[in-house]
Swiss-Prot record:
Keyword Nucleotidyltransferase: no
GO cellular component, as recorded: cytoplasm
Pfam family, one: Ribonuclease_3
Main location: cytoplasm
Protein name, per record: Mini-ribonuclease 3
Gene behind this protein: mrnC
GO biological process, alphabetically ordered: rRNA processing
Cofactor: Mg(2+)
Protein's UniProt keywords contain rRNA processing: yes
Organism of derivation: Bacillus cereus (strain ATCC 14579 / DSM 31 / CCUG 7414 / JCM 2152 / NBRC 15305 / NCIMB 9373 / NCTC 2599 / NRRL B-3711)
InterPro entries in the cross-refs: Mini3_fam, RNase_III_dom, RNase_III_sf
SMART domains: RIBOc
Active site: 17
GO terms assigned for molecular function: ribonuclease III activity; rRNA binding
UniProt superkingdom: Bacteria
Length: 135
């Protein structure tokens, strides 16, 4: 069994990236989005570093997270990947990594209910800020 509480933040983010991507793909298909180009464009609007950073800011501003979750975010944000982000600034990239670490953390702890709450909140925040994805 993997001890998510001791796992490297970048490893948590690695898992979280895959888990979050799966949630988003399911969400888009559930909304009836089936054309490949549309799926890619809409998917990117949820999984980009910029989008994930927006979610982190919202979760922190609204006190949505527990102290433990905020600690996971801090660990993820402070992790040094050694890579330079291509399409965003370092701060946005670090917040994105923090969000993915939080998703990976809950996934590996099998906290399905809380994972669902966080992901569905993220989707709601991004759809509201972008005017929805019903187009």
């Amino acid at each position: 069994m993997i001890d998510a509480k001791q796992l490297n933040s970048l490893a948590l983010a690695y898992m979280g990236d895959a888990v979050y991507e799966q949630y988003i793909r399911y969400h888009l298909l559930q909304k009836g989005k089936v054309r490949p180009n549309q799926l890619h464009r809409l998917g990117t609007s949820f999984v980009s570093a910029k989008a994930q950073a927006k979610v982190v800011y919202h979760l922190l501003e609204t006190a949505f997270l527990t102290e433990e979750e905020e600690a996971v975010l801090r660990r993820g944000r402070n992790a040094n990947s050694g890579t330079v982000p291509k399409n965003t600034d370092v701060q946005t990239y670090r917040h994105s990594t923090a969000f993915e670490a939080l998703i990976g953390y809950h996934h590996l702890l099998n906290n399905r209910e809380r994972l669902d709450e966080i992901v569905y909140k993220a989707i709601a925040v991004l759809e509201e800020q972008e005017g929805g994805t019903s187009s």
